[in-house]
Regions:
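Signature of uroporphyrinogen-III synthase
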Residues: 13-219
Length: 219
């Protein structure tokens, strides 16, 4: 059975480690390659309070595209993988909108002018409407996503099209990690997307789930 809490990772640790019955906490990290390492950098002060288990639930497969992207178009990255996919297309575009602080940092270091950034697609749409760009926009996204930002932009009078830049291939939880998760120890599992939640339900169960992305709780 799942117990979901919309909270920060710090609140999750406080709730579980303050309870004398909740010992030997497991932090289960399920992001694709590179994602778990980036996440740990943001919570280094908490890592000594738990055992970290690394078991990605997705393998990212980058896809080729025959779609021509005009150099003056504004790119939209709603994930780091969208940005990584664009690098494989050797695009010369200089401006972008992004979702996520890490995505913003990487885009900036790659030479992009980040016109606006937000924590989720819903708020990014609001920011784009405020910026009111006249250029065409290109959303480089994964095959499986929540919501449709491009359609929302077109419905608001903007020019936008999509490129499916990568596929998220499902992976099962590693067998040895699955046994630890099922051992009865308290588990904190950060969830960043509805897709990740559905994959988890398909593969295993955990006694405690902390939702980082508020959109997951609305699903």
């Amino acid at each position: 059975m799942f117990h979901c809490i919309a909270a920060s990772i710090g609140v999750a640790f406080q709730n579980m480690t303050n309870n004398p019955d909740q010992k030997n906490v497991i932090l289960l990290l399920t992001r694709p390659e590179g994602g778990n390492e980036r996440f740990c950098l943001n919570i280094e002060h908490l890592l000594g309070q738990c055992e970290i288990l690394d078991s990605p639930l997705q393998k990212i497969e980058f896809l080729e595209t025959l779609i021509e992207v005009k150099e003056e178009s504004i790119l939209i990255f709603t994930s780091i993988n969208g940005l990584r996919a664009s690098e494989k297309y050797n695009l010369r575009n200089k401006k972008c909108f992004v979702v996520g602080e890490n995505t913003r940092k990487i885009a900036t270091s790659a030479g992009y002018e980040v016109l606006a950034s937000s924590s989720d697609q819903e708020n990014l749409l609001k920011l784009i409407k405020l910026k009111n760009p006249t250029e065409s926009m290109v959303h480089i996204r994964g095959k499986h996503t929540t919501g449709n930002l491009c359609d929302s932009l077109k419905n608001n009078g903007f020019s936008c099209f999509e490129i499916t830049g990568y596929n998220q291939q499902p992976l099962k939880i590693k067998k040895q990690i699955f046994h630890k998760v099922k051992s009865g120890r308290p588990v904190i599992l950060p969830i960043f997307s509805l897709i990740k939640l559905l994959l988890l339900i398909y593969t295993a169960s955990a006694p405690e789930i902390i939702s980082i992305n508020s959109l997951v709780m609305k699903a």
